[in-house]
């Protein structure tokens, strides 16, 4: 419950930031109304298009049971065990080792893994990764993360447009009488940074829960712990290149564990995640599967 409240508060802060940007840049009640409308449209768009956006960003390709029988049957088996509809299965054409889930609810969900992760993880570790992604679907984290990514992207886009306007003289002084000059400057400089920090904080609140859900679903926390360690090392060697706004969807990232790394990381430190999994191992009954 604590993580859910924190996530809701962070999402509200992100939408509030989008509204504030419009207010400061456009000025007055018009800016406020436009900001509220933009936030509403962005969130509604994310609700219906979140899966399509994420899959397109990573160029994920759908696969059938005949094309990837081992992966397909693993997703099917774990979905049955979790008592959720089987999500669509995708493969990302990249040697970077990673995975993600997307979709607004379990009935409209998808799980995607890279070619790289299929090549390097043994079955028990891959099972832990798939179970982690299915837990995101069960918890509706996939929608939360997609909305956060889309709103953060809208904030960055708006700030970039304002920046271009300032540099290239778009609009006269009379056209912008309602705008607050200091607000415009602060928007261009700080809004994308603030949006990124909030978005990444949202992601970090969900990862421990997904790890724990994976451990309970497979009965094998240690396998996921090994997978996370292996994936972190490989992610630094072969990163999965895409829009940074969608990095929180991935199971692992490659940002260092220093203070600034933690602040701008979409995930908790891998060491902390591994420690939590090994602690959970002591609390779980003997693996039944």
Curated annotation (Swiss-Prot):
Swiss-Prot/TrEMBL GO biological process terms: proteolysis
GO cellular-component term (any): plasma membrane
Binding site for Zn(2+): 132, 136, 207
Top enzyme category: hydrolase
Pfam annotation, one family: Peptidase_M48
Location in the cell: Cell inner membrane
Membrane topology: Multi-pass membrane protein
UniProt cofactor(s): Zn(2+)
Cofactor note: Binds 1 zinc ion per subunit.
EC number of the protein: 3.4.24.-
GO terms of molecular function: metalloendopeptidase activity; zinc ion binding
Record InterPro entries: HtpX_protease, Pept_M48_protease_HtpX, Peptidase_M48
Keyword terms, alphabetized: Cell inner membrane, Cell membrane, Hydrolase, Membrane, Metal-binding, Metalloprotease, Protease, Transmembrane, Transmembrane helix, Zinc
Keyword match Hydrolase: yes
Transmembrane segments: 7-26, 31-48, 151-171, 182-202
Catalytic-site annotation from UniProt: 133
Family to which this protein belongs: Belongs to the peptidase M48B family.
Protein name from the UniProt record: Protease HtpX homolog
Native source organism of the sequence: Nostoc punctiforme (strain ATCC 29133 / PCC 73102)
């Amino acid at each position: 419950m604590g993580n859910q409240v924190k996530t809701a508060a962070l999402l509200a802060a992100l939408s509030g930031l989008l509204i504030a940007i419009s207010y400061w840049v456009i000025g007055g009640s018009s800016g406020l109304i436009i900001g509220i409308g933009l936030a509403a449209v962005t969130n509604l768009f994310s609700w219906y298009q979140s899966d399509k956006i994420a899959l397109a960003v990573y160029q994920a390709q759908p696969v059938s049971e005949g094309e990837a029988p081992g992966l397909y049957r693993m997703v099917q088996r774990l979905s049955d065990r979790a008592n959720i509809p089987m999500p669509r299965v995708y493969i990302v054409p990249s040697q970077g080792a990673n995975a993600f889930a997307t979709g607004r609810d379990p009935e409209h969900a998808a799980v995607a893994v890279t070619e790289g992760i299929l090549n390097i993880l043994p079955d028990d570790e891959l099972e832990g990764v798939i179970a982690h992604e299915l837990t995101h679907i069960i918890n509706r984290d996939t929608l939360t993360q997609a909305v956060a990514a889309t709103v953060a992207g809208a904030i960055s886009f708006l700030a970039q447009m304002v920046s271009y306007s300032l540099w290239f003289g778009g609009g006269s002084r009379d056209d912008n009488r309602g705008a607050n000059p200091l607000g415009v400057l602060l928007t261009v400089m700080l809004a994308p940074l603030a949006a990124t920090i909030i978005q990444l904080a949202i992601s970090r609140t969900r990862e421990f829960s997904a790890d724990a859900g994976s451990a309970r679903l497979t009965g094998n926390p240690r396998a996921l712990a090994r997978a996370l360690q292996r994936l972190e090392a490989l992610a630094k060697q072969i990163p999965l290149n895409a829009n940074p706004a969608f990095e929180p969807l991935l199971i692992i990232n490659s940002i260092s564990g220093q203070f600034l790394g933690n602040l701008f990381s979409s995930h908790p430190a891998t060491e902390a995640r591994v420690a939590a999994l090994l602690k959970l191992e002591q609390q779980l009954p003997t693996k039944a599967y």
